[in-house]
Curated annotation (Swiss-Prot):
GO cellular component: cytosol
SMART domains cross-referenced by the UniProt entry: Elp3
Coiled-coil parts of chain: none
Species of the source: Helicobacter pylori (strain HPAG1)
GO BP field: tRNA modification
Domain MTTase N-terminal: 7-119
Catalyzed chemical reaction(s): L-aspartate(89)-[ribosomal protein uS12]-hydrogen + (sulfur carrier)-SH + AH2 + 2 S-adenosyl-L-methionine = 3-methylsulfanyl-L-aspartate(89)-[ribosomal protein uS12]-hydrogen + (sulfur carrier)-H + 5'-deoxyadenosine + L-methionine + A + S-adenosyl-L-homocysteine + 2 H(+)
Any one GO molecular function term: metal ion binding
Family classification: Belongs to the methylthiotransferase family. RimO subfamily.
Protein known as: Ribosomal protein uS12 methylthiotransferase RimO
Keyword terms, alphabetized: 4Fe-4S, Cytoplasm, Iron, Iron-sulfur, Metal-binding, S-adenosyl-L-methionine, Transferase
Cofactor note: Binds 2 [4Fe-4S] clusters. One cluster is coordinated with 3 cysteines and an exchangeable S-adenosyl-L-methionine.
Residues holding [4Fe-4S] cluster 1: 16, 50, 82
Amino acid sequence: MQVKENKQLCLISLGCSKNLVDSEVMLGKLYNYTLTNDAKSADVILINTCGFIESAKQESIQTILNAAKDKKEGAILIASGCLSERYKDEIKELIPEVDIFTGVGDYDKIDILIAKKQNQFSEQVFLSEHYNARIITGSSVHAYVKISEGCNQKCSFCAIPSFKGKLQSRELDSILKEVENLALKGYKDMTFIAQDSSSFLYDKGQKDGLIQLIKAIDKQQALKSARILYLYPSSTTLELIGAIESSPIFQNYFDMPIQHISDSMLKKMRRNSSQAHHLKLLDAMKQVKESFIRSTIIVGHPEENEGEFEELSAFLDEFRFDRLNIFAFSAEENTHAYSLEKVPKKTINARIKALNKIALKHQNHSFKALLNKPIKALVEHKEGEYFYKARDLRWAPEVDGEILINDSELATPLQPGHYTIVPSVFKDNILLAKVLSPF
């Protein structure tokens, strides 16, 4: 029997869903603590940091400083994850308020580090396996599954390989065991994630690893629905798009950050791809029935000129992504682009403002296209007193949108799970829907 310690833990997980998986592994090691959202009452405050771009670093630092100010006497403050790893040589002096620093290699040893009250930075980047117990957060029906760590790409702007290392794929059997274990606990919807999902198993000499994963999950039949995030253009193929389209489990969801469309900019960004390849993949994705396409672009990369920006702008307006992340270039140490001549911030801000208008126009069109027709959805939990929170089954959690179902229109309370619903109203970036039936 698991016995709870009479101690409280406040976990703050910053950054991406990949970070969240590592946070859930740490929760698994600290199962005997009582969880609290109140840092002031916690005996242990654990902040899993993000160190991706400047804004993320500032958020991590501010969160640490706020926790240091709020923590009670005797409480332990821990900073783990990417920011700690990236700046491990200087961070102890820069933020002396922290009691324990650890990076990206020791998530499964967090209980030992707390007991010994010691710092640790293992060289090997940690990759969660099926035998690492996780406490899933935020949902009783959805879980993330990390299929690899690190990245072999050499993008000019990205510092991630400098602290997350080379591509390190899990064995397919380990992933299948984790999926089975989670499905037995009721998690029937999963999102598969990595730094570069489409390169899964490249490090083991296999070029169709993600296709094999899709086929294995289909054959296993443990899940009702799934999707894949973070496809990289140069390792994404028409065959992979076809495998997703043919799958009864994987949704027709395509998340492929293109970063730019101009050939000259793709070369400057060292993306190892071309406009022609992007267009071939994107057109194939659009041909898939009821496909949902998300992408990411960077505005103001060094040497981006007006002509290249106009080319990008015209393409985005013509293609009409369902969702689009727009980032301002962030100059990061240990990257090729760091020392290149910068585009003025004023120019970057003006370009982002113009692209945001385009992105919002097409996003709203994507939402409105769902009105007054049956769609498959996942109901996750009660949101406030009167509504259930749901999402289109194609959507990734948190980032793609929100659907609310009014409980006053229901004969009986809803259990989390899969339902056919009909959205009827789109207002304030939210869809309101009625439930037809479970499936």
